[in-house]
Amino acid sequence: MALATIVILETSALVVQMEVITRIRSWLFNHALPVWTEKCMDSRFGGPVESFSLDGDRPFTDAYKRTFVVARQLYVMSHASLLGEKKAGPLADALFEYLRKVCWRGPESGWVHKVTLEGDILDPTADLYDFAFCVFALSWYYRLTENSDALTLVHQTLDIVGRDFAHPSGNGYYNQLPANLPRQQNPHMHLMEGLLAFWEVTNDSRAKDMSNGLAALFRRQLFDKAAGAMPEFFDDFLNPIADSTRNHIEAGHQFEWAWILARHQQLSGQDHTDIVRTLVLNAERFGLHETRGWTMNSNKLDTSSQDRGSRTW
C-alpha cells in the first residue's frame, strides 16, 4: 500500500512537471521568442534595444547600451538557436559582432561598461558583472558556432579576471576596477555561472579550477550557515556587513546559487546537496510573497520582508 502511494505521488509529480515544461515551452516559442526575434535589435544604431515600454511595442529612447545587456541577448539567441528557433542564429551572429567590435577594448583592458548609441565609450569601468556575462554568453555562442574568436575572447577575459580582479588575499574577486567597497556576492555568482558554461562546452582546466574555487568560497565565506541565508554585501575581507541599513538578503539570488551549485555538482562530482536544499527551502520560507507567490525583491538580515515587490528574473 505504501509503495503504491509512493508510485502514485511520483507519477503525479512527473505529470505536473511535464505540464509545467509544456507551458513554459509554449510561452517561449509561441509568445516570447517571436516578439523578441522581431524587436530585439536596434535597426538604427545596431546592437540590441536596451528596453521596451510596458506594452512591448515601443522601445524607450535610451541614450546608451550596456555590455551585459548585449551579452545577455547573445546568450538568449545562441540558446534559442540551439533549441531550434530559426531566426535566432543570425541574430546571435549580429550580437556577437557588436559585442566584440563595440564593447571590447582589447586583451589589456577588456570590456567597457557602457557605450553611446553611436558606439563610443560612455563608461569605461571594468566591472566583473559585465565580464561574467560575457564569459557566459560567449561560451554559449561558441557552443552554437564553434567560432574560434569567441573562444579567444573568453580566454582573454579570464586572463584579465585572474590578473586584475583577483583579490590579493585569494578570497574571490573585486567588483570593479579600480577596486571599490562594499564587495558583493553577485558578480561571483555570475562569474561561476559563466565558468560552468565554458567548462561544459570546452572542458577547460582553468574554468574547472576557478569554478571549484568559487564553490569553496561560497561555502566558506559567502553563505551564513547560522542564518541559512546569504547576505549581499561584504567588507574587504568578505565578512558580511552587519548593518541592516546597508545590507540585505535576496531570495532570488539564493535560488540562483542553488541552481549553480547543483550544476557544479553535476560537472565536478562534489556534493552540494545539503547547501542546495538549505538555500531553496529557506528562500521559499522567507522570500515568497504569502498570497501572490512571487519571489520578493529583498529581505532584511533577520529574514523579515523588506521590499515586497518582485522582478521577473
Locate the predicted segments by residue.
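Glycan-recognition and catalytic cores of secretory/periplasmic carbohydrate-active enzymes
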Residues: 2-313
